[in-house]
């Protein structure tokens, strides 16, 4: 199949998942076309079967804000016609779904079938999408999609709860490349540099938005640090980073907390971490459990092994099969 993938090129979850999906589809013999305003950060290798098409937005004095959605629609149409795409897969509803719908309708006037699938990732539904000015457009764009997926049962339920969506939403979870994870070996030199006295390393990765409750990460680490030596790695960037850095200074944790910034490959740091800590509004990890896992090696090992066993259910090659089945289903109906 010739598949167009539209995503944000950033370090956020939707962009990473979309890029990794395209890379696996490429390995399985499909032709993949990425469409975005920048090259996706996780798209580092190119071949004859993978393409990147940049959306260029012209700036005119008349427009206070550049018309990105129109430029995106035009690029979708251009790529669909020039490369004879079979379908388009848009990740994150705003504004990709409405742009895809416009492109589909314009191409239909020329006798070209251009089905699109919308994947809902999170804040496009739970936060941003609930804005009264966005909701009618998002609802209509989702309902007009030829296929709709959500990355979790929770997100599907939230979509039905807050939007007038009539379309069937299929849950296809996020995935990880187990082969790549298992191939990454712990870097002892890196670990010793971060934790020279063998302190357990705690890691957080996010886009540092308010919903991630970044300050709570710091306060939790302070409680852990009061009981035992530890190091905290804060990976990523976003609007809450400066506030978190100031909090670290105020709590005198500056020698134990490292703000790494944006990095392409997180596996090496995760491999040397004892705990991955999340405190987002819709995700949580109990402080008492965190401390106990850090202190009791046998319990941590059991937790670790159970996590590995569970993660095998989300291997990229298995999950991508679900997307392929969705593509084939959509194409059979147009």
Residues covered by each model-derived region:
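N-terminal strand-loop element at the rim of the active site
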Residues: 7-11, 23-68, 169
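An amphipathic, basic-hydrophobic alpha-helix
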Residues: 61-88, 97-98, 102, 132-136, ...
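Carbohydrate-associated surface elements
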Residues: 154, 175
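Conserved donor-binding/catalytic core segment of Leloir-type glycosyltransferases
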Residues: 195-221
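Nucleotide-activated donor-binding/catalytic signature segment of Leloir-type glycosyltransferases, i.e.
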Residues: 245-261
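Aromatic "clamp/platform" in nucleotide-sugar-dependent glycosyltransferases that forms part
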Residues: 262, 281
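A short, well-ordered alpha-helix in the C-terminal region of glycosyltransferases
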Residues: 299-313, 325
């Amino acid at each position: 199949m010739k598949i167009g993938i539209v995503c944000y090129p950033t370090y956020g979850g939707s962009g990473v998942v979309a890029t990794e999906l395209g890379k696996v589809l490429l390995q399985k013999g499909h032709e993949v076309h990425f469409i975005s305003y920048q090259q996706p950060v996780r798209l580092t290798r190119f071949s004859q079967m993978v393409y990147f098409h940049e959306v260029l937005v012209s700036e005119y004095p008349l427009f206070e804000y550049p018309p990105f959605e129109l430029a995106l629609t035009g690029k979708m149409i251009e790529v669909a016609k020039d490369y004879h795409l079979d379908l388009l897969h848009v990740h994150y509803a705003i504004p990709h779904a409405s742009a895809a719908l416009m492109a589909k309708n314009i191409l239909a006037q020329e006798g070209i079938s251009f089905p699109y699938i919308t994947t809902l990732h999170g804040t496009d539904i739970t936060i941003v999408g609930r804005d009264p000015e966005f909701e009618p457009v998002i609802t209509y764009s989702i309902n007009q999609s030829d296929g709709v997926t959500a990355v979790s049962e929770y997100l599907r339920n939230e979509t039905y709860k807050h939007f007038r969506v009539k379309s069937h939403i299929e849950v296809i979870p996020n995935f990880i490349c187990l082969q790549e994870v298992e191939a990454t070996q712990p870097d002892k030199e890196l670990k010793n540099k971060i934790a020279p006295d063998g302190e357990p390393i705690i890691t957080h990765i996010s886009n540092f938005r308010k919903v991630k409750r970044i300050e709570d990460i710091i306060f939790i680490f302070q409680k852990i640090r009061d009981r035992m030596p530890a190091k905290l790695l804060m990976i990523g960037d976003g609007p809450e980073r400066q506030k978190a850095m100031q909090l670290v200074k105020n709590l005198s944790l500056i020698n134990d907390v490292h703000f790494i910034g944006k990095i392409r490959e997180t596996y090496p740091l995760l491999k040397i971490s004892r705990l991955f800590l999340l405190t987002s509004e819709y995700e949580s990890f109990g402080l008492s459990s965190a401390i106990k896992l850090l202190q009791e090696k046998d319990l941590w090992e059991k937790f670790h092994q159970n996590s590995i066993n569970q993660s095998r259910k989300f291997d990229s090659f298995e999950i991508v099969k679900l997307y392929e089945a969705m593509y084939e289903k959509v194409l059979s109906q147009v």
